[in-house]
């Protein structure tokens, strides 16, 4: 008995299939150790072969492995460049703990300073005094601030709002005997160069009425007609926010926008050392054969470029040569999904296919580890096609789409395209969107969620309600939760179930649908049938997304690898591993493509 092990080392998962002639004996998989193609990853593959040998009670005669190329999926936080708004400055928006409600515009009045002399802006008391917005520096103390505000209001000073540098907005508001908007966690240094400040707080979920209305804002700031366009641009960025602070720069004052101005989506978000800011000369970029493009605008261009168009990725660590690159702009996804602004962040996600190092002999390394002959007879895409065509009903001319963690491989009878960006890119997008670890995002991305209402009730994405099989932890109340490895996995409080569904599907379209269309355009040719294999192919939602991405008359189905071989089917996974096990075997390879609806397949290349 000659048993061949097909070994497929992926970016996230290592899969092994044992075949004895035309019989599929068994399959197994484990997470890939280290970087794909590294010695650690091959050690993990060898250990998996030995584990499957023990499980099946047999010994492998020889093994097959394809040449390996790794895909890097990175998250680059690139705050969106604030639009030009003239003298208007966006100070903050979307603060989590505001106090009170209302809208007010006035001159800054600093509580840690003496009142201005009579007749100057900010002096209160006499009728006609200028409206003021109180400034509470961090460390001033909420009790002291509230006492000072009560005294000012009692003295007739027209203070209609307060801004706090600390996080004591609610504490200050609760100690006032007046209803006025209080916003905390404000960068008061950004207010220093402003002669007028507008503050608005609305109930959670309600839109702004003053700061999102260009006409009202222009009137509040006494803007001339020439600056009406600046108000319109700024107000457009505040759609969907329920609180915000806007300033009017004083003539000749410092420019807060030069160093402090942030987009609404960055409000309250800490910057990491690698973040690029507007005006940075060292921001990430991509380079094709003809041009160099900054990464953020390139995100909108890459889906229209052919696979392999990007040759170099430049980051703070220096330029890196790549065979392909795919990028995803979360801010653009948010706009397309009509998500509330600021809820998806401003990161650009990049998946790049690194060039294979010269002289890499993965078969030799694996042979030393196993003590067996190991051959590289097929590329990964070719092996995946051979394995996928063992699906019952597969046509010999079918186009196989192997969806992996790092790449989307599209393989036709006469050509193949390997496009960077797949499951890991989606995981990174979900993790960045929800601010959760990637390990949790790997479960959250897979399908529908529910919102836990109390201990045992839930609300589903379609609005239906029901009872949980078992009580949820008290900490999960009010949270979205998805099926996890040990029951419900709570993951978010910021989105409704329906909103998260819309965002999740849009992320899948952006990460998989757009990339698949790019790969198919690069490959060219007709689509008589499309077979989906690989780990992500088990995502029922993703199947629907890809169906909508392709022409309506193209039959698209999920592979059932090994379905025409003897032995149990391996399902939608293990296509490359089974294909490697079949490589070079004429009688076994002839079974690829045979099924109830497919006639005999032509002889496979070997």
Predicted regions mapped to residue ranges:
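Residues forming the flavin
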Residues: 7, 12
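Nucleotide/phosphate-binding catalytic cleft detector across ATP-hydrolyzing
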Residues: 1-6, 23, 30-397, 451-454, ...
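Catalytic or ion-translocation cores adjacent to nucleophile or general acid/base/metal-coordination motifs
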Residues: 195-196, 414-444
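Conserved structured core elements
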Residues: 402-404, 420-424, 510, 574-575
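Phosphate-binding/catalytic loop of phosphoryl-transfer enzymes
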Residues: 389-416
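Short glycine-rich, Thr/Ser-proximal phosphate-binding strand/loop in the N-terminal lobe
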Residues: 13-40, 415-425
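Conserved structured catalytic cores and adjacent interaction surfaces
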Residues: 411, 416, 423, 530-539
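A short helix-loop
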Residues: 438-461
């Amino acid at each position: 008995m000659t048993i061949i092990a097909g070994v497929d080392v992926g970016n996230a998962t290592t899969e092994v299939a044992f075949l004895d002639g035309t019989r599929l004996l068994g399959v197994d998989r484990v997470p890939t150790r280290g970087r794909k193609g590294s010695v650690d990853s091959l050690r993990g593959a060898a250990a998996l072969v030995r584990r499957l040998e023990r499980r099946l009670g047999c010994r492998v005669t020889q093994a097959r492995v394809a040449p390996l190329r790794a895909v890097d999926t990175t998250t680059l936080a690139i705050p969106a460049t604030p639009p030009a708004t003239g003298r208007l400055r966006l100070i903050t928006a979307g603060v989590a703990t505001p106090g009170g409600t209302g809208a007010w515009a006035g001159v800054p009045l600093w509580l840690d300073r003496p009142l201005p002399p009579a007749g100057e802006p900010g002096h209160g008391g006499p009728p006609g005094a200028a409206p003021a917005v109180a400034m509470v520096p961090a460390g001033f103390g909420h009790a002291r601030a509230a006492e000072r505000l009560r005294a000012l209001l009692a003295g007739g000073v027209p203070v209609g709002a307060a801004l706090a540098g600390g996080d004591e907005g609610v504490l200050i508001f609760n100690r006032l005997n007046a209803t006025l908007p209080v916003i905390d966690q404000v960068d008061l240094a950004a207010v220093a160069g402003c002669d007028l400040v507008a503050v608005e707080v609305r109930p959670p979920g309600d839109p702004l009425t003053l700061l999102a209305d260009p006409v009202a804002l222009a009137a509040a700031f006494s803007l001339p007609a020439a600056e009406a366009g600046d108000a319109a641009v700024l107000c457009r960025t505040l759609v969907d926010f329920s609180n915000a602070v806007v300033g009017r720069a004083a003539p000749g004052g410092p420019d807060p926008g030069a160093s402090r101005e942030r987009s609404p989506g960055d409000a309250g978000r800490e910057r990491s050392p690698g973040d690029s800011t507007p005006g940075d000369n060292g921001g990430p970029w991509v380079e094709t054969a003809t041009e160099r493009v900054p990464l953020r605008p390139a995100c909108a261009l890459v889906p229209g470029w052919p696979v392999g168009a990007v040759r170099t990725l430049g980051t703070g660590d220096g330029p890196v040569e790549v065979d392909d690159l795919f990028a995803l702009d979360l801010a653009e996804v948010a706009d397309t999904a009509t998500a509330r602004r600021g809820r998806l962040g401003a990161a650009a996600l990049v998946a790049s296919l690194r060039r294979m190092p010269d002289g890499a002999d993965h078969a030799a390394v694996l042979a030393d580890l196993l003590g067996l002959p190991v051959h590289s007879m097929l590329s990964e895409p070719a092996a995946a096609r051979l394995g996928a065509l063992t699906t019952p009903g597969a046509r010999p001319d079918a186009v196989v789409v192997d969806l992996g963690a790092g790449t989307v491989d599209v393989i036709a009878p006469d050509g193949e395209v390997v496009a960077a960006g797949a499951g890991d890119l989606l995981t990174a997008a979900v993790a960045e969107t929800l601010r959760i670890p990637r390990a949790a995002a790997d479960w959250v991305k897979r399908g529908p969620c529910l919102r836990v209402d109390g201990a045992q009730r839930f609300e589903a994405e379609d609005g239906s309600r029901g009872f949980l099989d078992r009580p949820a932890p008290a900490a999960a109340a009010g949270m979205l939760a998805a099926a996890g490895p040990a029951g419900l996995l709570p993951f978010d409080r910021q989105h409704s179930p329906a909103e998260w569904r819309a965002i999740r599907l849009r992320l899948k379209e952006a990460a998989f649908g757009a990339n698949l269309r790019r790969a198919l355009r690069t490959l060219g040719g007709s689509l008589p049938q499309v077979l989906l294999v690989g780990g992500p192919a088990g995502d029922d939602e993703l199947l629907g997304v890809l169906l909508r991405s392709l022409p309506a008359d193209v039959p698209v189905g999920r592979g059932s690898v090994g379905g025409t071989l003897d032995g149990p089917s391996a399902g939608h996974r293990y296509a490359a591993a089974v294909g490697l096990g079949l490589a070079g075997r004429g009688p076994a390879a002839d079974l690829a493509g045979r099924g109830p609806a497919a006639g005999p397949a032509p002889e496979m290349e070997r």
